[in-house]
Amino acid sequence: MFAHADQVVELDGGARLSALCFDGPVESLNRTDASQPALFTCGLACHAAMVEQGGELPVAGALGLSLGEYTALALAGVFTFEEGLRLVATRGRLMQRAAEASKGGMVALIGGDEAKANEVCAAAAQGQVLVPANFNAPGQIVLSGHAEACDRAVTAAGTLGLRATKLAVAGAFHSPLMAPAAEGMARALEHVEFRPARCPVWSNVTGKPHGKDPATLKALLVDQIVKPVRWDTCCQDMLAWRKASGLDGSASLHELAPGSVLKGLMRRIDRAAEVTTHDTVEEPQRAKA
């Protein structure tokens, strides 16, 4: 799959995606124009390895955070690996350009709810952009906006009894500062045929499964670039759906490579929900994903 990815996309400077994934350097891999196709490829390669080593692995439902929503849609058969890789490579380039043009940042807010996050934004914006961008888990919200507003947000959070930390990111993702990227992504999505999903896939914007209308799905993917990711709502709704569908005992939760960040967030959302991570696929599980 990595060899196929190298044939589909070419990174800035002619770097091969496979070499960047396995050998770095980290500084290059951390650029969103490189990290997005890398994450997409790693996730689908991980699933393919699980199937190869352990046999058929039916996907009962899929969700992914930010870029991961494209991985989830590919697993559900909405588009092919190659189509998805081209889309996320375009998304990464557009967001990288918007980030460099807007000089923004992001701040992790610990301990507050949505109302407190809005209060911090109101106090720190001072005419600039500063908005909640990621609702990751209860008590864990990320703000996004102009760099100066992010600096002020750290101070404002402290006065409200909250902890805040600036994140080492390339830009103000999931905020209005990404509007140029959203416009470009809308044009890119027009040229890709979306097929009916084989399973429910949750929208980062609504926190609910996508409907059957391809145009609405594409519009939500565009909105996702400039609107907050409601990951906690996605997970809560997915768990409720799994229980209502009678899948609690048969459909296990799997986090595809790389990393285990989502497993950590799920502990905050529902400690009873067990997530299996697959940074390396040495013991594939023949359970529904």
What residue ranges belong to the model's regions?
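Alpha/beta catalytic cores of group-transfer enzymes, especially the acyltransferase/condensing modules
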Residues: 7-13, 25, 75-228, 264
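FabD-like malonyl-/acyl-CoA
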Residues: 1-119, 167, 252-288
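Alpha-helix termini
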Residues: 12, 53-54, 125, 241-249
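Post-His helix in hydrolase/transferase enzymes
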Residues: 181, 288-289
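Structured loop/turn residues at beta-strand edges in well-structured enzyme cores
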Residues: 57, 196, 248
